[in-house]
Amino acid sequence: METNFGYRAMALSSSSFSPSIFLLLLSSLPLIFSATYPNNHLHLSSTASFPKLQAEKLIRDLNLFPKEPFNSAAPDPSFLAPKIVEKRFNFPHLDYSGPSSEELGHHAGYYRLPHSKAARMFYLFFESRNRKNDPVVIWLTGGPGCSSELAVFYENGPFQIAKNLSLVWNNYGWDKTSNLIFVDQPVGTGFSYTSDDEDLRHDEGGVSNDLYDFLQAFFAEHPQFAKNDFYITGESYAGHYIPAFASRVHQGNKAKEGIHINLKGFAIGNGLTNPEIQYQAYTDYALDMGIIKKSDYDKINKLLPQCAQAIKKCSEGGGDCVDSYVVCNNIFNQIMNIAGDINYYDIRKKCEGDLCYDFSNMETFLNQKTVRDSLGVGDIEFVSCSSQVYEAMLVDWMKNLEVGIPALLEDGIKLLVYAGEYDLICNWLGNSRWVHAMEWSGQKQFGASATVPFLVDGAEAGLLNSHGPLSFLKVHDAGHMVPMDQPKASLEMLMSWMQGKLAMTETKERVAPQ
């Protein structure tokens, strides 16, 4: 899912992750291991041990572990050319009594990544239910290594999965106001695959280059959308992906590398972007929300200097980046040792079931033969969260991705950071702090901006600060996954932001027609 930081179903053993521990989204359970990582490749000791905190209940009854640690397939000579292979599709079990599949414009495809040995990236593209000249929006789920199909079926996609595995239309899908792309990335995630593990990515440079190459091929395949406004969105660990991807697109445009991509903005929902600031906010948020007591707060805060020092070593050389992951996640783990069975994605709820939420219907649905045939994915088993992709990206975890954002703001590319108020793991407080601490020409004015209500149907749905291209929105009554918890508000947020009207306080309804 999303760090969620994706939704991570991941655990560690001597060579990869073992189903003895399950990490969902950005969830970080206690982790103690010895590691060496020459050339940015991580090798975990077989002596790795994990406290039993929530481990068994996280894996019980949910079969999200793939047979392989990441999706792989034998090389196919017909796939050697870097190109898009795409088909229009209809999902079974969905009422298509309205427009035809041709009119709907639902596409599934694979892209052969040029800077790889055998990697193919899977994507879904849903043309707007409104106007074809609506903006093109790409959504990235976190993990790292978790499939964007989690968002398709549980957040902002066109459909929702019913208990009987039938599909119903999502009245607040983001395809009601945009031409919407979901990508399984990095390679090895979801239906994306490779036959060579050297294609796995270890940093945002590799991730952003792959996404940029994909966009170039996508707009070459769909030139009628190339001049539309373009926005990058996502949540959780995508707080890393999104700034790097936006910078890569902007760099490509300035260098005139290929098709000009009309990048207008990027939005990060409950993301991990500046780990040093955000990890320091854990105890403040936990104390404010009554999760820990003052004595706990004082004790856990003694870990903060060690975390800050580990992040500094990571940023200066990279050799200690896995160590910084271990050291800093001890802060979160100490809080969870006290909190017990709280749902760290929504502290109003108990963590019940596997991932604190039950997403097992999606796994069952996507592995049905009729669905796989419809999507054209052949015999590839759907992987919700790839353990090996997650492991490969650990050296990237504690990197600060905020550093590239000011240059984008100065060039007029707008940023929306939004966060549900009841999420612990990527809480609104930490996100607000890095946004306010970011140095750019409008920093002082943004810090002095009035906090105004964000209204939906005349009712306050959040609190907004905004100046120039930068906006921060604290969303009421939502946890880690805002589009799932507040679907109407999230659609209104997207529409208003893309139209430059997010700071408006009028009660006028702007949600797309039903």
Q: Predicted segment positions?
A:
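Terminal and linker regions of secretory-pathway proteins
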Residues: E2-Q514
